[in-house]
């Protein structure tokens, strides 16, 4: 946790100059956006969250933030962004609250814990809550029900009750910074339509997936497919090298044949084959193996909940658990290539 906080602070310190000279200038000089919501609260200022906040400010929203990391909070305050000590205080200043947190337990605590977002359930100011964390659908639905049981302090247009959307993202840190994330959204469709301008300020694509929890379900399924695809691509490339085919040649074959996939043509796991991806920098940056292990655990729990057979989840869990135990938990998940091959790299 301490390492993660230090990494976030380092990213923020590099980001600070551009944030102040760019985002806040654009906010002060640009016309207000046409969305019905203007005051947005944001909780969770990690590697993804602080970049998403920057894009909200670029789009003209007035943002109030909170994080348990006081150093990050201080840095945002110094950049001219309003901060609050508790989630409840953020809610009091916001029409919409977005959360981007590490786990189901964190999300549950921020919503329903001491000084949580839903404190004073008969007097809630935000009409809309958007959770972009990657958590299990069951927890999402529990929190959504708790939100719907609250009452609004002031009714807005056709909003009789506050509403929650689950809107996890795909694209990682680079997409968060560029504002090109993909949002997978579950919840009432009218709330999704109202939230689209906010989502579009942080992402390129938003896909409505159905009722509450379906966004979370889509994210878990997407990451399961991503994990299995990476395992298959890594095993194929490792086998090819062992049989005497260079990884670059086999990659060309895959990418012009039926084996083509995101793991081969956009995120190749073999060092030296592709520039700008984690495998080209000793698997640093990107999506940590421990996070993939967490998401596979969520997929396994969800599969068990509905009685779905999941042999590939189990195998992927086993491999990523081993990778983490061997000290690769903070390395990008494409380092699983090392599980299959330890020969000479192409450089």
From Swiss-Prot:
It is found in: Mitochondrion. GO terms for biological process: L-leucine metabolic process; valine catabolic process; valine metabolic process. Residues 1-34 form a transit peptide. The active site is at 219. It catalyses: 3-hydroxy-2-methylpropanoate + NAD(+) = 2-methyl-3-oxopropanoate + NADH + H(+). Transmembrane segments: none annotated. Signal peptide: none annotated. PROSITE patterns: 3_HYDROXYISOBUT_DH. Keywords: Branched-chain amino acid catabolism, Mitochondrion, NAD, Oxidoreductase, Transit peptide. NAD(+) binds at residues 38-67, 101-102, 134, 294. It comes from the Eukaryota. Pfam families: NAD_binding_11, NAD_binding_2. GO terms for cellular component: mitochondrion. Its main location: mitochondrion. Pathway: Amino-acid degradation; L-valine degradation. Belongs to the HIBADH-related family. 3-hydroxyisobutyrate dehydrogenase subfamily. This is Probable 3-hydroxyisobutyrate dehydrogenase, mitochondrial. It comes from Arabidopsis thaliana.
